[in-house]
Structure formats: structure tokens, C-alpha cells
């Protein structure tokens, strides 16, 4: 199976299946001397693990991380970092009645067409549990970014029709509700909406927003590895993501150049922008202002309502999916989006060291 490695200089390779013995990641290209502990990585994994509220799957997994290599006495050694998380609460029998069915909204049919066989137990590699490796690798990248003064703030902007206006954000309450929304009142409204979805045996999608602060100007690799293109690819590779926008995104289609252009000013010897419609990126290169990224998350495809589909014999059938499934995946996907953004930024920062001879001289002379 190709496509399980992401990155150029800072790379992650994820492995494992939803109902296999374990999942994990190998992180390559991490510099030596970065402080890193299991507790630090665990804090990231805890943000995505299941069973933390009525709005997540009831599957009970501690998602406890083990560091197998690449860290010694609390610091990275510069060698590959191997991280593993054991599966403990698989219930594969939940899938026996649908193992020969193509579940609507899932990758069952396409995997059959590509490989000629598939792991029907929870979707195998297509399961949301695949993101464990992304988050563990993202924790390593985030630790590097912290050392460089770069901060990522990621949260749920919308669940279903409940969307928080930008002028109503309160970042201090993001971790005070299980939906990771930056407004307590809107979090309550979203919870009520999700209660109705559960009652209707249905699910919801939503919108995740990531704000990146402290990113220096000049990072990004034109033409095909632009910063925004790289971020979009990274985030779009997450199974539940159906769209990515940077800055004003799709709303620019109804704007004008006189409005959309961000005017520059010089202040205390610094070049600044008066607005940030571009979302911190111009020409595929960071401009020094905050990078603003949003990811559209589709409704969880596993629902208990009867749905029409086809089985592997080509017969028209109707199924209702039982088992333990999230009515909304958005809150658990927040840290996944953040992790993929962190991995992308770390990789491009390392690539940027080759853009000027002065950078190499600073290292070697």
C-alpha cells in the first residue's frame, strides 16, 4: 500500500488498522536535542481518544502511547522516532452482519475495486483510528514548533448549523467543553443540536479552524509545494475532510480586488498588513501574519437509519449500521487537523534552510 508516508525532510509513516493489535507512526527527520516525553505526546492523543462524552463513540480505548526509539533521557536523538498505541477494545463481531455490504459514505467499495479485498472490521486503514499516528507525529512536530516560537490554536468553529461568529471567540474556553468550541453558549447550542441528531439516529458535520501565529515570513516552496497547497494536501488527506480554505477562502469569489487586497504598512521597521484576507500566505509563501486555515468535516457516515446499498454479490439491499460510532467526528478531528498542519510547517521550515546561502553559512561557518 503506497501513500502512508507524508513529508520530505520531516516525514511521518503511519501504520496499523482499527481492529489490529496496534497502530503507530515512525517519525523521520526530527533533529536531536528536542525535549520530548510520553506525557507530552499523550496530551495530544487524549484530545482525540474516544469515549470522552456522549457525542463520541463508546469504544473504550486509553490510547496510551509508547516510545520505542529515537528518544533518550527525555531528548530526541536524531534517529527515527517510533511510537505505538495498542488497541484494547475491538469488537469485530459488530461488523459480521455487514462484512459483505458496501456501507454508504465509506470506502468499502473503492477499496474492493483497488485491492480486491478489504478489512471489513471497522474499515481497517480507512478507520478514524488511523489518525492516531498522525496525532502522535504531530505532537513531535508541535514540540519543534514550540522551540521556534510558533503556536497553533485549533478549535471547532461550527457543528451543523451552529456556527460561531469570529467576533464571539473566547479562546480561553476551548478546552472547557468537549466540543472544543471557543464560545460556551454556542457549545450548548451545538450540544442540543447533536442530541437531536442522536435521537434521529443521524449524524452531523462541521467546520474546524486553525490559527497559526509566529510563522516567519518567507516559508513555502513555489511552484508546486506552496505553503497553502501543502497545508491543503495535508489536511485533505484526513479521511473526514471534504474541503479546505485559507484566509477568506471561497468567499473571495464575491469580493473585489479593492477589498480583498491586504494593504502593507511600515511600522517600527517592520512590514505589516492592515488586513489579513490572504490568511497569512501570498504566492504560496508565508508573509509573517497569522495563517488562517479551515477544514470542512463531513457527517459521520455510520448511522443507524436504514440505508439502501449493494452487497459484494451485486444485490440491492438495505442496511442499518449498529455498533459504536460518533454522531459527530468534528471535536476529535480538531487535533488531527492541527497535527497535519504542524507536520507540514515543520517540514517546510526545514526545506527553507536551502533557500539562501546565508542560512547554510550560519550553520557551517
Which residues fall in each region the model found?
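Alpha-helical support elements that line or immediately flank enzyme active sites
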Residues: 21-33, 128-150, 225, 229-233, ...
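Glycine-rich, N-terminal phosphate-binding loop and its surrounding beta-alpha-beta segment
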Residues: 44-104, 108
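Glycine-rich anion/phosphate-binding loop at the beta-strand->alpha-helix junction
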Residues: 15, 21, 201-204, 208-316
